[in-house]
Amino acid sequence: MKQSKYVAAFMIWASAALLPVGTLASEQESWEFGASIYGWFPDISGHTSFSPPGGGGDFEIGIDQILDNLEFTLMGTFDARKGRGGLLVDMIYMGVGNSKSGVREGTIGGTPIPVGASAAVDLDLDSWIWTVAGYYRTVDQPEVKFDLLAGLRYTDVEQKVNWNITGNVASIPVLDRTGTAEAGLENWDVIVGARGNYSFGANNTWFVPYYLDVGTGDSDQTWQAIAGLGYKFHWGEAVAAWRYLSYDLPSDSAIADMNFNGPAIGVTFRW
């Protein structure tokens, strides 16, 4: 029900915001398109909790205690604009996994891993993040572009953990000392935000892009910020940027919070 409520709200907004595009643009204005491919290399932090299917206490661990290995990424953006109105679609897929031994942070059944004990942990995390937004260009000058936007962010995260606690384990129930569990989340959030760029230099070939959005829905709060430096070519542009994406999630969620923070590089083709 929550998901359908957010989808319905977005569809109402999209109908109101995007249908007038044809009247805002003159007959002489044509569609402009942009497609971007990029690499993002974030540090991942957060806190996750797993409930073993066979019973026993929950196993909790900080995501950043384990994950430091980006196995596979697929990322891209598509932009379509006519006149002052347009549509933006951004897609991120990340497959992340790692194994670590000697882990002492974390809890099992609500109790910290005891002194003299440690865990060997194998954690895999797969995430799809889609952002779809309509936007309106409020400023369209050679040096300055500025858009207001609103839309939806869809997040699908699946994670799996294997753990084995050794050492001083007398205080840990036998059932909790080793285990395998899976947990995940599927979120819909409504977002609002702004983006733009400032061009400078000879023929305005250098530019500073920026983006900010904030939203809520299934998440208590999600927000994203991007800033960087780019250079324009006849076919499009190349950009180096810093990107931060944050989720503050309900306390009863399998993932209590999650943050992605790091550099990104990419190219955009325009036609």
Locations of regions flagged by a protein language model:
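Short glycine/proline- and aromatic-enriched beta-strand/turn motifs that initiate or cap beta-hairpins
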Residues: 24-94, 201
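Residues on the lipid-exposed face of transmembrane beta-strands in outer-membrane beta-barrel proteins
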Residues: 35-37, 76-82, 132-136, 150-152, ...
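Transmembrane beta-strands of outer-membrane beta-barrel pores
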Residues: 39-43, 63, 82-84, 91-97, ...
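Extracellular/periplasm-exposed beta-strand and loop segments of Gram-negative cell-envelope proteins
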Residues: 43-71, 93-128, 155-187, 217, ...
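Predominantly the C-terminal beta-signal and adjacent terminal strand-loop region
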Residues: 225-271
